[in-house]
C-alpha cells in the first residue's frame, strides 16, 4: 500500500513531482497536488502579463477549492497485490499459496484450511482444487467463482441467450411484390376501403361516398364546333362493361349503325337537327323507336331523352304544351350574327292589331319574320312599347311618344321617315317612332314577347343554359374536391400502414448482422 500526502500536510510532496495533468493512476492526494501546481503556474503566467487581479482571483479560488475537497474526504490508498516468495499478499495481510511456476496455468491442492469469505464469496476449505491464472494472478475455483474479483462475470451466468440462435431478419428486395403487395387481409374503414385485387380486376374507380363506379374518360356531348374532342363538356360516368350509361340509349360503344366501310366512327351521335332540339339524345336511326313507360313533354321529346330536366323548354307541365322549336341564327343586314343562336317557334305568330285610336303605338301589321322567339308563358309586353303621355317642356301635353324614340316637330330636319312640313317649316304636329330601334333579327321594332331572363341572348349549349351550368359547375367542383381529398387521405393512410408493417416485420436493426451470418445491409 502506498500512501501520499497533500501539500498542506507535507510541503515536500508538492515539489517532489512536477506533473501538471492528473491521471487515473494517481491517488486523490496526488491529483490535488497536480491541480494546485497547475493553478499556481496559471496565476504566475497571468501575473507576468499584467493581469494582477485575475491572477490573484484564480489563485485564491483554486486553493480554497482544493482545501475544501481535501477536508471533506478521507485519505485514499491504492490497493494491490505483491508476490512474495510465491505467495500473493493483499493489503489485509492475507496469504494464498500459488504454484511457483507462473508460465502456464496450473492447479494444485491447497493446504487444509477453514472456509472464509472474501468479497462476498465463500472460499472452500480443505484441499479444494484451485485454478491459477498467470495473467491476472487472481486464483479462481474450478466452478468458475472468482476469489478476488467477484461479480465480474455475472453477466455470463446461465445458459446461452436464445436470441443469439435466431437468424437475423433480412428484408426482401423492393421488387418482391409477393411480399410487399397489399392483400385482401385489410381492415376496411371510411379511409381504407379499396383492395388491390379488386382494382387490378376492375380498374381504377373513385372512392368518394364508397362508390365502386368506374371513372372513364369524358363523353363529350357538344356539337357546335367541328373539333368535338376538344369541346368543353360536363363529366359523365359510364359503366365498366362498355355500355353507355344513358337513359333510353343502351348500346355498345363500337356499335354505329349505317357506318360506311372505312369510315371512322363519330365521337358522339349525330343529332337530327333542326327537327329536334340539341338536348334530345336521339340519333336518326332511333327517332322512330317507340319507348314505353314514358310521358311526352313536347312532340317527339320524351323524359328519357333529356339529360337535364331543367332545360329551356323541357319539363313543362302536361296541360301547358308548347309548339316545336328550332335553333335559329339571327341575321343582321343579311349576315349571321356571330356566336348567337336562339330558339324560335316553327309556327308563325298571329298578327297583332294596332290600337291607334286609344293613343297606343301602331302595331297594325304582321311582323316580317316568320319565326318568333321562344318565350315563357308570360303576357305579351305592350308595356315597354306603350305610348306614354309626354310631360317634356315644349311638347304638347299628352302627346304619344314611343319608348326609345325622340319626339320632335314635324319637318324640324329631314331624316328617313320624317314628314316634310308645309312651306315655312311651321310645326304642325309631333310624331313618334322616327328613330327605329332594331332587335337582334334586324326587325325595326322589338318583339311583342317578354324576355325569359337576362341571359337569353348569350350562348347556350345542349346541357343547360348558363344560369344552370354555373351551379352545376360549383357542385362538380365541390364533389371533385371532396373526392380528391378522400383519395389523398386513403392513399396516405395506406402508405403509413405499409410503412408501419414493414418496420414491424423487418425492423431497422443492422447491429452484428455480419457476425450472425447476415449481409449487414438493409
UniProtKB/Swiss-Prot annotation:
InterPro entries: P9_TM (IPR043915). The chain crosses the membrane at residues 33-50, 55-72. Keywords: Membrane, Transmembrane, Transmembrane helix. One of its GO terms (cellular component) is membrane. It is found in: Membrane. Belongs to the IIV-6 213R family. This is Transmembrane protein 213R. It comes from Invertebrate iridescent virus 6 (IIV-6).
